[in-house]
């Protein structure tokens, strides 16, 4: 089915208690230079990952809607990935499978949609303008196309500022999972005006 011009998917409302669990700590440590060899090495180690997956909590907050879901993100190859959103009851709300030139999405009614742009599809079906193309890099702790960013005292990404399609996205990282090598983001928050997207990763599996 081709993509409609109206919203179809409605996830469960966001409980107020969930917001406090995703609150990011304020970092006061001095940052490191983006030109440092340690940062270049960390970027290269992350880019060398062929496959990875993570799961955790997702929150979207705007003036129009508040949404909470569990998410599962799996990358199986270059530009091949799967995104699954489930509600607090464990039911699937959205499943997206993407590969070069072909994106398929199944909603909570089992209806299947196809398109060639995952970011546009998510926005039209859910009403949430998630910068999915950039988020694929940001969730790994990489700046993507952004040139305005800061590092923490461990030479890892701590903040990104990026203008895209008239939106000014700010990404703040609240910590990293040092149990994985290389260390991967543990939680992060994206904001543009009154819109906020929060991700809290429970664990990572990297290869």
Curated annotation (Swiss-Prot):
How this chain sits in the membrane, per its record, is: Lipid-anchor
Q: N-palmitoyl cysteine lipidation: where?
A: 22
- Identify the stretch annotated as signal peptide in this record: 1-21
**Protein location:** Cell outer membrane
Top-rank taxon of the source lineage equals Bacteria
The protein's UniProt keywords, in alphabetical order, are:
Cell outer membrane, Chaperone, Lipoprotein, Membrane, Palmitate, Protein transport, Signal, Transport
**CDD domains reported in the protein's UniProt record:** LolB
Which Gene3D superfamilies does this entry report, sorted A to Z?
Answer: Lipoprotein localisation LolA/LolB/LppX
Q: What does this protein do?
A: Plays a critical role in the incorporation of lipoproteins in the outer membrane after they are released by the LolA protein.
Q: Which NCBIfam families match?
A: lolB
Subunit structure as annotated in this protein's UniProt entry:
Monomer.
Q: What is this protein called?
A: Outer-membrane lipoprotein LolB
Print the organism lineage: Bacteria, Pseudomonadati, Pseudomonadota, Gammaproteobacteria, Enterobacterales
The encoding gene is lolB
């Amino acid at each position: 089915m081709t993509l409609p011009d109206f919203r179809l998917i409605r996830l469960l409302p966001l409980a107020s208690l969930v917001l406090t669990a995703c609150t990011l700590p304020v970092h006061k440590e001095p940052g490191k230079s983006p030109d440092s060899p340690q940062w270049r090495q960390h970027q290269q180690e992350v880019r060398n990952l062929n496959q990875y997956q993570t799961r955790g909590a997702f929150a979207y907050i705007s003036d129009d809607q508040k949404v909470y879901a569990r998410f599962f993100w799996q990358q199986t190859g270059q530009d091949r990935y799967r995104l699954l959103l489930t509600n607090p009851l464990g039911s699937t709300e959205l499943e997206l499978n993407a590969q070069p030139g072909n994106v398929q999405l199944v909603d909570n009614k089992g209806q299947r949609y196809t398109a060639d742009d995952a970011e546009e599809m998510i926005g039209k079906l859910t009403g949430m303008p998630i910068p999915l193309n950039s988020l694929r890099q940001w969730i790994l702790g990489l700046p993507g196309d952004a040139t305005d960013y800061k590092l923490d005292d461990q030479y890892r990404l701590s903040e990104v500022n990026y203008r895209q399609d008239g939106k000014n996205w700010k990404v703040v990282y609240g910590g990293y999972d040092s149990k994985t090598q290389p260390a991967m983001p543990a939680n992060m928050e994206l904001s543009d005006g009154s819109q906020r997207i929060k991700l809290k990763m429970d664990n990572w599996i990297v290869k």
